[in-house]
Structures are given as C-alpha cells and as structure tokens.
Amino acid sequence: MKEIFFAKNDLSNLEYSLNREVLRANVSNAYSCTTLPFCNTRKYHGLLIVPQPKIDNQNHVLLSSLDETINQNNNSFHLALHRYQNGVYSPKGHKYLESYELGLLPTHTYRIGSIVLLKQMFFQEKQDRLLIKYTLKEA
C-alpha cells in the first residue's frame, strides 16, 4: 500500500494545506476531522467528535484542538495554528511542520532547530478514546 505523504512546502502553504482534510474514525462512530496543519476551519472540525445518545443523539466535539508548546533554552515554540476573524492566524505552528505521513499510524513530524518531534494520533478500536503519542526523535 502506498502511503500518502506531504512535505514541508505543502504544509507551510496555508492556501494548500487548509484545503486538505484528514478524517479518521473507529467502529464506535467516534471520529477526528481537521486540516493537515491541525487548524479547524469548519464547524464540524475537531480532534475527538463523539455521538452522545444520552444527551441528544448528535455528535459533539469533545476535544477541539491542542495547543502544544516546546520549551527550549528559555524560548517557547507553539505548535498550534488557529484561524481568527479577518484571516488572522496565530500561533503559526505550521512553520515547524516538516512532514505528514498517512500510513497505519498517521505521523506529523515537527522540526524546531535541532529538535525533531513525532506526533501520532489514533483511536482505540471500540472506545470513544483518542490516543496521542509524542516521540522525541532528535534533540
């Protein structure tokens, strides 16, 4: 099976990457839907969306996004990307994205100076649970 791969040029180009959505789901109907750089641009975007039969039988966004920060030598590097009114984006974490590979375990690779960080997100098969794994590959 050929894996889908996006390089830094694709990910740092917001006109391109914000128009590419990633959808992952499991058998319990939980799902994650967002753009390549994790910037939610639509109402239905989120990292963990789960049907709530005890409330109203509708899907609810339980986890919208994460605002991860890497601290190195008294400097903070924010990995998130949010879109605000008038086309303002902040913080600009997409500039640290090195690659995205969609395989069995989707992997975002971030590079901040000499640090290389892998971020993998996957669902437990039959539970409404999203697992996020970070691996420090180089430092």
Give a label for each model feature:
Residues 1-139:
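Terminal accessory carbohydrate-recognition/targeting modules of carbohydrate-active enzymes
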